């Protein structure tokens, strides 16, 4: 708490105790609930024990973001980056940020009986951010193999906002990484449903005189779609067609014709903004920085 100059909440204190005790940990909590702070605590705990830390993300953009954040927190000389495209201070860093694929590849050589990657020397903790990617049909094996091949002496911290079965994941991690026959629980679970920062959904369209381009996707109660978007629904288009004298049968003919590929492309040209337009809307709304998928 002295490091952060503000009191930690109960959820963060519980996580800190688990990490200091040396256990691996699965954390499932909404965005904005303090998972990043828990990750930073794991890093500090490793550094204080004279160990190194590895922090993985699924995206290069997120890795770059974490490099900036951790450089401010721990100092540029202590933090490095490796994404496949870029290497920053990779040989000397005590805190390495990388994509999960990079770490998996580092672990492969050791699993295949080769010489242990020197960058894993003295690593005390591996932090897997967005660990729910385990369930991804295309990339999930990367997270699975990373957990399986990670040496059992290295502490694991798995972070996610959306994982649906954290206890099952914790049990599986313990099963594949246990190196003894004791009954002690080596991987624990912490779950929180509290969302201190509200999650808001927005839509972005090309602006014109009828709509501003960027707005809330849901109504003020969060129960239905924003009324501004009603004219673009099938029901809204049918009402508009009838309002201007169209018959229902004619509407269905019109609707089916608009299913054609050229009309869908026309709809996209009219409504979907260019990247520059969408970024300009985010700038005007003071919603940067952002990650574009």
Task: Map each language-model feature to its residues.
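Conserved interdomain linker/interface between the two RecA-like ATPase lobes of SF2 helicase motors
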Residues: 148, 155-157, 162-171, 179-293
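Conserved adenine-nucleotide phosphate-binding loops and their immediately adjacent elements
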Residues: 1-3
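Conserved P-loop/Walker A NTP-binding site and adjacent catalytic elements of P-loop NTPases
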Residues: 6-178, 183-197, 201-205, 289-293
């Amino acid at each position: 708490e002295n490091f952060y100059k503000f009191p930690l909440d109960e959820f963060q204190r519980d996580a800190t105790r688990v990490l200091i005790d040396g256990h691996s940990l699965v954390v499932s909590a909404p965005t904005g609930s303090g998972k990043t702070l828990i990750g930073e605590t794991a890093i500090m705990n490793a550094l204080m024990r004279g160990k190194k830390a590895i922090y993985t993300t699924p995206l290069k953009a997120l890795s770059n973001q974490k490099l900036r954040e951790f450089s401010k927190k721990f100092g540029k000389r202590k933090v490095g980056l490796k994404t496949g495209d870029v290497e920053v201070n990779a040989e000397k860093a005590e805190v390495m940020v990388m994509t999960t694929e990079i770490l998996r590849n580092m672990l492969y050589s050791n699993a295949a009986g080769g010489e242990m990657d020197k960058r894993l020397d003295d690593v005390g903790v591996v932090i897997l951010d967005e660990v729910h990617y385990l369930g991804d049909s295309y990339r999930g094996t990367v997270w699975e193999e990373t957990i399986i091949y990670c040496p059992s002496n290295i502490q694991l911290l798995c972070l996610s906002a959306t994982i649906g079965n954290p206890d099952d994941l914790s049990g599986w991690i313990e099963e594949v990484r246990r190196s003894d026959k004791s009954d002690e629980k080596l991987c624990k679970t912490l779950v929180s449903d509290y969302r201190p920062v509200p999650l808001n959904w927005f839509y972005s369209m090309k602006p014109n005189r009828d709509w501003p381009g960027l707005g809330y996707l849901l109504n003020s109660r969060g129960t239905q779609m924003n009324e501004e978007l009603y004219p673009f629904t099938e029901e809204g288009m049918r009402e508009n067609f009838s309002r201007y004298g169209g018959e229902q049968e004619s509407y269905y003919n019109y609707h089916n014709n608009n299913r054609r590929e050229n009309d869908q492309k026309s709809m996209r040209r009219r409504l979907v903004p260019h990247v520059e337009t969408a970024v300009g809307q985010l700038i005007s709304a003071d919603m940067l920085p952002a990650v574009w998928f």
